[in-house]
């Protein structure tokens, strides 16, 4: 008798993806973040669904409906803070996942990598629109500033901005459509993640050595299901510590004031996970140039498979590239810090140097390091 999971049409798909999947025997904890991102997405969709039941996307009542959720709905405060901090956790896992991909050369799987970049853009769009919904001061002004960037597009810019706003300023129509998009996008993300997995399972997982592992594979279950489960337990422990003890640590105090179009906050800034891109945007004095740099700060990842010069895939045995990788990590952290600072000396010049360094490391120094390391192999 054949096992049901190997014959049933639906269970067969699950079996090939999560049970009998041949997996490299030596992948480390850095490979846990894919499943952790899945957990984050489930947390966000579940908590978001319950929030949507009580939220009203109207400029007059949006702010008070969020207050009502926190005060009057059973465990509403918990659901709200789970959703807000869940977004931060999502981006922490996302950036670690991308960092792992760069370090171990996972970008060589071009289709998987490119769909990952699309997932990053979708997640950033979802998070931005979600930040607008509570209709606090930073929600309103963040939406105004970021949507206004589209006016930098020549000829059609102004029309495009007014089309997105649904009027001549960020108002009820904008809030309404942002709520609609914020609700539907996570399901599109979930579907795209399935495609991401589909392409990954076509090639199989990479491993820390960056070498083919066909000769040494083990089934995903029970070895990596238990490993993923441990990762999830640790993630949830960290998550609930944040939610229950430091719920506002990563938020902006300005968002506890209702949106006021007549009063501009002293420092308009997005959530912490966009600050590095915001710093790159601000470091260029030209509006269109800044928008192009902002988009390129993410799109530059798509160039990685095409500018790799090294004969080795992973950075594990490449000391120069390792140094440049950690320099890049430090640079992104510096950009994150700068993005949260006011636009005044010395922050302006630090931001410009850090932005220049970001693109220089990825586009120039890393390919050069690869060539040098190839020569070192022959010594």
From Swiss-Prot:
<keyword id="KW-0472">Membrane</keyword>
<feature type="transmembrane region" description="Helical">
    <location>
        <begin position="113"/>
        <end position="133"/>
    </location>
</feature>
<dbReference type="InterPro" id="IPR016174">
    <property type="entry name" value="Di-haem_cyt_TM"/>
</dbReference>
<feature type="binding site" description="axial binding residue">
    <location>
        <position position="196"/>
    </location>
    <ligand>
        <name>heme b b566</name>
    </ligand>
</feature>
<keyword id="KW-0813">Transport</keyword>
<dbReference type="GO" id="GO:0045275">
    <property type="term" value="C:respiratory chain complex III"/>
</dbReference>
<keyword id="KW-0830">Ubiquinone</keyword>
<feature type="transmembrane region" description="Helical">
    <location>
        <begin position="77"/>
        <end position="98"/>
    </location>
</feature>
<keyword id="KW-0408">Iron</keyword>
<comment type="subunit">
    <text>The cytochrome bc1 complex contains 11 subunits: 3 respiratory subunits (MT-CYB, CYC1 and UQCRFS1), 2 core proteins (UQCRC1 and UQCRC2) and 6 low-molecular weight proteins (UQCRH/QCR6, UQCRB/QCR7, UQCRQ/QCR8, UQCR10/QCR9, UQCR11/QCR10 and a cleavage product of UQCRFS1). This cytochrome bc1 complex then forms a dimer.</text>
</comment>
<dbReference type="GO" id="GO:0008121">
    <property type="term" value="F:ubiquinol-cytochrome-c reductase activity"/>
</dbReference>
<dbReference type="InterPro" id="IPR027387">
    <property type="entry name" value="Cytb/b6-like_sf"/>
</dbReference>
<keyword id="KW-0479">Metal-binding</keyword>
<feature type="transmembrane region" description="Helical">
    <location>
        <begin position="33"/>
        <end position="53"/>
    </location>
</feature>
<feature type="transmembrane region" description="Helical">
    <location>
        <begin position="288"/>
        <end position="308"/>
    </location>
</feature>
<dbReference type="InterPro" id="IPR005797">
    <property type="entry name" value="Cyt_b/b6_N"/>
</dbReference>
<dbReference type="InterPro" id="IPR005798">
    <property type="entry name" value="Cyt_b/b6_C"/>
</dbReference>
<keyword id="KW-0349">Heme</keyword>
<comment type="similarity">
    <text>Belongs to the cytochrome b family.</text>
</comment>
<keyword id="KW-1133">Transmembrane helix</keyword>
<dbReference type="GO" id="GO:0006122">
    <property type="term" value="P:mitochondrial electron transport, ubiquinol to cytochrome c"/>
</dbReference>
<feature type="binding site" description="axial binding residue">
    <location>
        <position position="182"/>
    </location>
    <ligand>
        <name>heme b b562</name>
    </ligand>
</feature>
<keyword id="KW-0812">Transmembrane</keyword>
<keyword id="KW-0249">Electron transport</keyword>
<dbReference type="InterPro" id="IPR030689">
    <property type="entry name" value="Cytochrome_b"/>
</dbReference>
<feature type="transmembrane region" description="Helical">
    <location>
        <begin position="178"/>
        <end position="198"/>
    </location>
</feature>
<dbReference type="InterPro" id="IPR048259">
    <property type="entry name" value="Cytochrome_b_N_euk/bac"/>
</dbReference>
<keyword id="KW-0999">Mitochondrion inner membrane</keyword>
<feature type="binding site" description="axial binding residue">
    <location>
        <position position="97"/>
    </location>
    <ligand>
        <name>heme b b566</name>
    </ligand>
</feature>
<dbReference type="Pfam" id="PF00033">
    <property type="entry name" value="Cytochrome_B"/>
</dbReference>
<keyword id="KW-0496">Mitochondrion</keyword>
<feature type="transmembrane region" description="Helical">
    <location>
        <begin position="320"/>
        <end position="340"/>
    </location>
</feature>
<keyword id="KW-0679">Respiratory chain</keyword>
<feature type="binding site">
    <location>
        <position position="201"/>
    </location>
    <ligand>
        <name>a ubiquinone</name>
    </ligand>
</feature>
<dbReference type="InterPro" id="IPR048260">
    <property type="entry name" value="Cytochrome_b_C_euk/bac"/>
</dbReference>
<dbReference type="GO" id="GO:0005743">
    <property type="term" value="C:mitochondrial inner membrane"/>
</dbReference>
<protein>
    <recommendedName>
        <fullName>Cytochrome b</fullName>
    </recommendedName>
</protein>
<dbReference type="GO" id="GO:0046872">
    <property type="term" value="F:metal ion binding"/>
</dbReference>
<feature type="transmembrane region" description="Helical">
    <location>
        <begin position="347"/>
        <end position="367"/>
    </location>
</feature>
<dbReference type="Pfam" id="PF00032">
    <property type="entry name" value="Cytochrom_B_C"/>
</dbReference>
<feature type="binding site" description="axial binding residue">
    <location>
        <position position="83"/>
    </location>
    <ligand>
        <name>heme b b562</name>
    </ligand>
</feature>
<comment type="function">
    <text>Component of the ubiquinol-cytochrome c reductase complex (complex III or cytochrome b-c1 complex) that is part of the mitochondrial respiratory chain. The b-c1 complex mediates electron transfer from ubiquinol to cytochrome c. Contributes to the generation of a proton gradient across the mitochondrial membrane that is then used for ATP synthesis.</text>
</comment>
